[in-house]
């Protein structure tokens, strides 16, 4: 094989093995299945050397998945290119019902040569670290909710009822400390559930404190601070958005960012009939959930609260102007859509979609180091 050729190398990556296939860039060249290799660095080095004996330019391709981006970061150090592609956007034949590692690797190589794959954005190492910390906080919130549900379900089975106003406030916690269960065994269960709630609460507090500390030295911290100029976008929402998306300005238009977050309507159009449905829900669920949570703040009339004013004081006037423009626009739109009989959840998602555009506009005003 000529040393001037480019090889496209498809890899179906798993925890302990990688299925490998390759094809030359020449039209009509046959896709060759190489076999399965291990996932150690020495196995990857051996594969690179073998492929380099066949061509000078190597392009490795694999699907984004649970194995992360270590291959993407390792292969360029060996002088090769690497693409991470979106598995949900890989073309499939409707009648194809056979799926094996061999077929997947060969398909990746073939589609890479044809240019039919969509490459995903890979975050920098430090950006991914902040994202992991942000997601760990989300996991802690979920675990805390589950622990509270178990405790409340246990008390309900024992017909032990709290008659106060708010759960998990000081009065409720004092009441829990006085609860006596019918039997010693059930008292043990109750105390273990109480301890689980306390442990998950402490874990959540630790992660939130660590996230606050780590973001201070993060290269994208200026964007996090600027996004907090928007109503409903406090620290956790802002850091979730930036950690999950990265540099918002990598999207050329706000609509591209809306599409990435799955906030645009689905559509089925045939002939002269056009149907639009619910949002696509494609893309990043973590960012979309945080965005919708922040959008609920616009159900009230436009107003600069004391907390928002404190955040605005540290920011340039151009960002303050965008913040107020967003409030006026989104609060009016919320009331208008509700008055037309739209469900509150539908309205909030519509507000979230427009809120993304204002986030993009603010991010354009903030210089970010590479």
Residue ranges, per PLM feature:
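A detector of single, family-specific signature residues
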Residues: 1-370
């Amino acid at each position: 094989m000529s040393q001037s050729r480019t090889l496209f190398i498809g890899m179906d990556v798993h925890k302990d093995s990688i299925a490998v296939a390759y094809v030359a860039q020449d039209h009509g060249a046959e896709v060759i299945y190489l076999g399965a290799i291990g996932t150690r660095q020495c196995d990857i080095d051996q594969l690179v050397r073998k492929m380099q004996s066949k061509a000078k330019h190597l392009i490795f391709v694999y699907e984004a998945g649970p194995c992360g981006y270590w291959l993407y970061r390792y292969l360029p150090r060996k002088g090769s290119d690497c693409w991470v592609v979106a598995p949900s956007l890989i073309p499939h034949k409707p009648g194809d019902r056979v799926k094996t590692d061999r077929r997947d690797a060969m398909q990746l190589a073939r589609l890479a040569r044809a240019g039919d794959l969509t490459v995903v954005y890979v975050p920098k190492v430090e950006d991914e670290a902040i994202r992991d910390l942000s997601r760990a906080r989300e996991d802690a919130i979920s675990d805390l909710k589950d622990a509270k549900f178990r405790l409340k379900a246990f008390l309900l089975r024992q017909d032990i009822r709290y008659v106060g106003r708010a759960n998990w406030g000081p009065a409720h916690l004092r009441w829990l400390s006085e609860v006596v269960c019918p039997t010693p065994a059930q008292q043990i269960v109750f105390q273990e559930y109480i301890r689980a709630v306390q442990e998950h609460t402490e874990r959540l507090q630790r992660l939130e404190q660590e996230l606050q500390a780590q973001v201070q030295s993060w290269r994208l911290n200026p964007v996090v601070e600027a996004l907090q100029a928007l109503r409903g976008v406090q620290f956790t929402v802002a850091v979730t958005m930036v950690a999950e998306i990265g540099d918002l300005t990598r999207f050329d238009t706000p609509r591209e960012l809306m599409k990435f977050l799955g906030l645009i309507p689905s559509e089925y159009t045939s002939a002269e009939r056009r149907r639009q449905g619910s949002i696509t829900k494609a893309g990043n669920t973590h960012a979309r959930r945080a965005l919708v949570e922040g959008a609920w703040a616009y159900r009230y009339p436009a107003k600069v609260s004391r907390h928002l004013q404190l955040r605005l004081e540290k920011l340039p006037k151009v960002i303050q102007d965008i913040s107020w423009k967003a409030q006026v626009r989104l609060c009016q739109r919320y009331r208008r859509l509700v008055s037309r009989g739209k469900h509150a959840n539908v309205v909030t998602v519509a507000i979230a979609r427009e809120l993304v555009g204002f986030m993009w506009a603010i991010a354009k005003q903030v210089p970010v180091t590479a």
